[in-house]
Amino acid sequence: MAYSNGLLVHTAAQAAKEATVPISVHLDHCQDENMVRRACDLPFDSIMVDMSHHSKEQNLAKTQELVSYCHTKGKATEAEPGRIEGGEDGISDTADLSGLMTTYEEVQQFVDSGVDFLAPAFGNVHGEYGPRGVVLEWDRLAEIHNIATAGGVLIVLHGVNRFPQDLTRKLVAAGVTKINVNRDILMDYYRHLEQNVGKIPFTQLLEEGVEKVAESMALHMDICLSSGKA
């Protein structure tokens, strides 16, 4: 975005336009207010207005202001009331994190802000889960989903590193519309680079790496039950 007048964004948008299936170009975790406004002048379909690094009050106020601006530019918006950061050892007990979980009041406030997609915290973390594994509060998710959908807002899930396939499908059944998958998509790519860098031509390394990403993406489309829906 910051270089060559957004050339990479324009390239991605053109590729999406020429695709044989519907594809949107999304800007994730945009935490700079000026960058959000800049993104509105580029061919993004949606922008995550991520003000979660501010206090809860500032997050809501800034989100509401930026969501309004994005909508005047025809951009869909995503936001998160707060986030739980995982570490190398993960999260020991979600009971200690009750103050960081998304509350029903916050859901209603963000729905009222005009946001299109909401990424709540109900036990999911950004980062590692640690030896205890994933511990989600399903009742909280159910009520969050009820409040959000009543206001026409869709639920997004962040923090799905190494989720079992059956858990991901259970989340889809629970009403999650969009699932952000990053690390799991790239692991085979990283492994391919580590095993082959310096051993094969650079162009071959990249081409085969892209194939690894495509294979991982196809697998996750199957897991999320989105394959064949275009």
Predicted features and spans:
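Alpha/beta enzyme core
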Residues: G6-P22, H29-G151, Q165-V176, V181-E194, ...
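Extended, intrinsically disordered, low-complexity segments
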Residues: E194-A230
